[in-house]
């Protein structure tokens, strides 16, 4: 059944996003790409070969916002199948490990001579989140639904295994 949707050359990847909370607000980054309007996402990006989910969440947060953090757990796992692309989306809770302020970082996947895709980093209250286009929408809905419990992860991440 699933093999019917797979195509030679299909792009497959795992994206890891970080939920960072401060005083009831979530940290978001705004992207702008040449082929679409600006949109908001949780800080995150593609899992690199040999990298664990916790390592990716912490690395991406540091690259995009300058914040250092420790991994707290997995909140959500989603899956997206679109023409030519299959993405597993992992949303992880991380806890800042210092006093630093979030600053606009960079996306190392963007060529140095290209226009940056990261445009803004901002703390957003739950009330503000309702009016923002946060992608994917399924994550936005869950973040709003779970706002009252402080986005505490369940014990579902079993860790990496060597074999």
What do the PLM-derived regions correspond to, one by one?
Residues 1-17:
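Acidic, metal-coordinating catalytic segment for phosphate/diphosphate chemistry
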Residues 35-39, 111-163:
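Nudix hydrolase/Nudix homology domain
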């Amino acid at each position: 059944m699933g093999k019917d949707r797979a195509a030679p050359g299909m792009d497959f990847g795992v994206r890891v996003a970080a939920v960072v909370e401060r005083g009831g607000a979530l940290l978001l980054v705004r992207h702008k790409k040449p082929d679409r309007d600006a949109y908001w996402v949780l800080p995150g990006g593609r899992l690199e070969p040999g990298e664990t989910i916790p390592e990716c969440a912490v690395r991406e947060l540091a690259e995009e916002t300058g914040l250092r953090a420790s991994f707290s757990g997995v909140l959500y796992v989603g899956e997206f199948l679109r023409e030519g692309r299959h993405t597993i989306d992992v949303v992880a809770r991380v806890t800042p490990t210092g006093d630093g302020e979030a600053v606009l970082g960079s996306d190392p996947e963007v060529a140095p001579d290209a226009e940056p895709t990261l445009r803004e980093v901002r703390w957003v209250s739950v009330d503000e989140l309702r009016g923002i286009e946060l992608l994917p929408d399924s994550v936005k809905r869950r973040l709003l639904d779970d706002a009252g419990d402080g986005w505490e992860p369940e014990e579902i991440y079993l860790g990496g295994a060597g074999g």
